[in-house]
Amino acid sequence: MTVYHFVGIKGTGMSSLAQILHDMKHTVQGSDYEKRFFTQTALEKRGISILPFDKNNIKEGQVIIAGNAFPDTHEEIVAAKELNIPVHRYHHFLGDLMNQYTSVAVTGAHGKTSTTGLLAHVMQGAHPTSYLIGDGTGHGVENSKYFVFEACEYRRHFLSYYPDYAIMTNIDFDHPDYFADINDVFNAFQEMALQVKKGIIACGDDEELQKVQAKVPVIFYGFGEDNDFQARNIQKRTDGTIFDVFVRNTYYDTFKITGYGDHSVLNALAVIALCHYENVDVEAVKHQLTTFEGVKRRFNEKPMGEQVIIDDYAHHPTEINATIEAARQKHPEREVVAVFQPHTFSRTEKFLDEFAESLSKADQVYLCDIFGSARENKGELTIEDLQKRIDGAELITDTTTDVLKKHKNGVLIFMGAGDIQKFEAAYVKEVQVAEK
């Protein structure tokens, strides 16, 4: 019996892949740091073993899949090589796996996870679909027709993939610790485009994506009239969004989605265009769009007393703009309060003014200390450099969250890609203790 062992199984992509293989009746286990991570819940529900890192975890006959964050000097990877066991890097293994299906890669600087989740949900309503989402969610179906997966541009990892289709949501400068500038990012996407085998669904409102060249048809979607798929007559409501879709200037149908903000309309348009291209029944698409409940850490909302708490992964100025816009659409009468934890010193330094501008669209801003990545845990920059650029911004720690109580009718948006959930949990606990 082959055992698939994941080195770093709690990583979001790794966790998703482990779930897929388990669902396909393979034996799966993995190792990681003992600190609890949100991806553990889905692994534990499936009974997948999570071990502490130990070279003795590695045994002959296993298939070793290693997360991209772990170097070749990691004790388990060294142990595998000593036993002459091949070590498959996550993105290479995924690239081989998807070749068994009609594969759809979802990529872009922003909106990847939400669009992947939405596409997987919609496709499942019509055909057996396996999927891998960057929020740590994965699902495998043995007789799948489609394989939908999130493909990340960071360090050009998506160049390991040769998908049938690619949805490209946008090109924007991010990951300044790796990419030199917007041209470097564009070149990565251009290279990816040349690896797609059947067709590309790209946002035509994005100036960078308009320049992409490909060997396959490129279908553009967006709000502009030049797009192949265009959203018109948009009704932004507190219970979602309704819009008409025109295909090459001819009315196609009217759709309702559960999401808020322009970015949610664009994500849905991408899914509608892909499904149209694959002849998925439009009634199935319409129904599935109305039943989508979202993905983890993307505008996840819960009421707490008179307040509303939103948990969101937004960690780039463009994403912060979108999240605040969505909150204002759904809760037009409420005060919008942003609680933001910058993620990585390099990103914070590069986009300092842009962060200040986007956060200033909230009514009140609270800033947590900068969360350094594993590759860079210190920098000369401090959170005060961002604070002084935002009028009225206050600093907050996980022991001073009680200050948020004064926003009695507020929408509290906890945003960040680090451990911002620690601050949210501290505040929830603070409120619960006060209520006793």
Swiss-Prot record:
Keyword field contains Transcription regulation: no
Cited SUPFAM superfamilies: MurCD N-terminal domain (SSF51984), MurD-like peptide ligases, catalytic domain (SSF53623), MurD-like peptide ligases, peptide-binding domain (SSF53244)
EC number per UniProt: 6.3.2.8
Molecular function (Gene Ontology), one example: UDP-N-acetylmuramate-L-alanine ligase activity
The organism's place on the tree of life at top rank: Bacteria
InterPro entries in the record: Mur-like_cat_sf, Mur_ligase_C, Mur_ligase_C_dom_sf, Mur_ligase_cen, Mur_ligase_N, MurCDEF_pg_biosynth, UDP-N-AcMur_Ala_ligase_MurC
Functional description taken from the UniProt entry: Cell wall formation.
PANTHER family in the record: UDP-N-ACETYLMURAMATE--L-ALANINE LIGASE, UDP-N-ACETYLMURAMATE--L-ALANINE LIGASE-RELATED
Family statement: Belongs to the MurCDEF family.
Protein name: UDP-N-acetylmuramate--L-alanine ligase
